[in-house]
Amino acid sequence: MNILITGGTGLIGKALVKSLSGEHRLTVVTRDITKAKETLDSLSQNSPVSFIDSIDAIDDMARFHAIVNLAGEPIADKRWTTSQKKRICNSRWDTTAQLVAKINSASSPPLVFLSGSAIGVYGDKGSQAVSEETPPHSEFTHELCAKWEAIANTVDGHNTRVCTL
């Protein structure tokens, strides 16, 4: 399969690239291609990873069988100031909206779009077990994840299956 990955240099993305690179052709969207190559080339198994620096560089999503969207400003690296919250949100929402637009306009869209989310959709429940039926708690992480998932789910589902992680 030919797979497009955003957020490929993050914690989950690096593990995913390592796992998939032996059997699939991977293209990673990254802001810093040089740094991404340094990080990921040693992880990829017998299969070189391709890199692009912008979703806009993709003419048509038809070449991809799947898209894995893990992009986003790290959530735990800095204090959640108003400006940091904005970066956290926009880095996820804007990237996802760009991908959705590309998928929906593709001549032959990918079969699946996997888009990140987080346990944060449920908020701080302490030791309480949560499931998909657990009602969300209104706080920053819930609002972040709820909108992120809502944007991902605007993909035309007739052609592309959407999975939020």
Identify the role of each PLM range.
Residues 96-139:
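Conserved Rossmann-fold NAD(P)-dependent oxidoreductase catalytic core, especially the SDR/UDP-sugar
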Residues 29-34:
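N-terminal Rossmann-fold cofactor-binding loop
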Residues 3-23:
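N-terminal Rossmann NAD(P)H-binding glycine-rich loop of SDR-like oxidoreductase domains
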Residues 117, 150-165:
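Conserved beta-loop-beta element that borders a ligand/cofactor-binding pocket
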Residues 44-98:
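NAD(P)H-binding glycine-rich loop region in Rossmannoid oxidoreductase-like domains
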Residues 86-93, 130, 134-149:
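Short-chain dehydrogenase/reductase
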Residues 10, 72-73, 119:
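Flexible cofactor-recognition loop at the NAD(P)H-binding site
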